[in-house]
Amino acid sequence: MARLGVNIDHVATLRQARGGTEPDPVAAAAIAEFAGADGITIHLREDRRHIQDRDLKILRQTVQTRLNLEMAATDEMVAIALSVKPEACTLVPEKRAELTTEGGLDVRIHQEALKLAIEKLQAGGIIVSLFIDPDPDQIKVANKIGADYIEIHTGSFAEAKSWKEEELELIKIENAVKLARKLDLGVNAGHGLNYNNVKKVAAIGGIEEFNIGHSIMSRAILVGLDRAVRDMSELVRYA
């Protein structure tokens, strides 16, 4: 049975739009956990456009499930992670001009820097995942440099323009899961998943956790966060 990690970045985005104190991502995390979330995911970006250092520090004290910190593999972020000690860190690519994370890490090009970050984080007792496209070469290098997990970038599947294209992307994801499992890598997935498409990916099997944010927060505006999390949790667990 797969787990659901709820990404609360968009709660912080709404707060930062006015530069005030509400809505508070810390409160949203508590509601999500009460509703059945298995973990809370946040992305502390270098430009601090949504989640702030204050959020991370308080969430480390209040999250009762598990805290997953998405971050760039920079010296600053590694130092922050080692001081806060989330259960897991997911290393992601980061561009200041992007609206959200676009595509997976190119582990082949950046393997030396990623390997160093992985080693430092693991030495601090933190589980490390790499956010990558469902590409066999990327998975093999992720394993080579010592990652504990991969998180499969499901954006191409979510943005497929036709049934045929969607099926091809599902096959890529399924093959990626099989390869990762063969290499003893844990597997998570996320990006672009919503209430209409997540069951197709969850039905593949072998994916331990789905990290979902935008779709849950969009639904929460209409039905409330508790209901939105419960509905997504049911889809993920019983696909």
Swiss-Prot record:
GO biological process annotation, one example: pyridoxine biosynthetic process
Subcellular location: Cytoplasm
Swiss-Prot/TrEMBL site (Transition state stabilizer) positions: E151
Keyword Nuclease: no
Pathway involvement of the protein, from the record: Cofactor biosynthesis; pyridoxine 5'-phosphate biosynthesis; pyridoxine 5'-phosphate from D-erythrose 4-phosphate: step 5/5
Subunit architecture: Homooctamer; tetramer of dimers.
Enzyme Commission no: 2.6.99.2
Binding-site list for 1-deoxy-D-xylulose 5-phosphate: D9, H10, R45, H50, T100
Binding site for 3-amino-2-oxopropyl phosphate: N7, R18, G192, G213, H214
GO molecular function, one term: pyridoxine 5'-phosphate synthase activity
Protein name: Pyridoxine 5'-phosphate synthase
One Pfam family it belongs to: PdxJ
Family: Belongs to the PNP synthase family.
Function: Catalyzes the complicated ring closure reaction between the two acyclic compounds 1-deoxy-D-xylulose-5-phosphate (DXP) and 3-amino-2-oxopropyl phosphate (1-amino-acetone-3-phosphate or AAP) to form pyridoxine 5'-phosphate (PNP) and inorganic phosphate.
Reaction catalysis annotation: 3-amino-2-oxopropyl phosphate + 1-deoxy-D-xylulose 5-phosphate = pyridoxine 5'-phosphate + phosphate + 2 H2O + H(+)
Active site location: H43 (proton acceptor), E70 (proton acceptor), H191 (proton donor)
Keyword Lyase: no
Organism: Geobacter sp. (strain M21)
Keyword terms of this UniProt record: Cytoplasm, Pyridoxine biosynthesis, Transferase
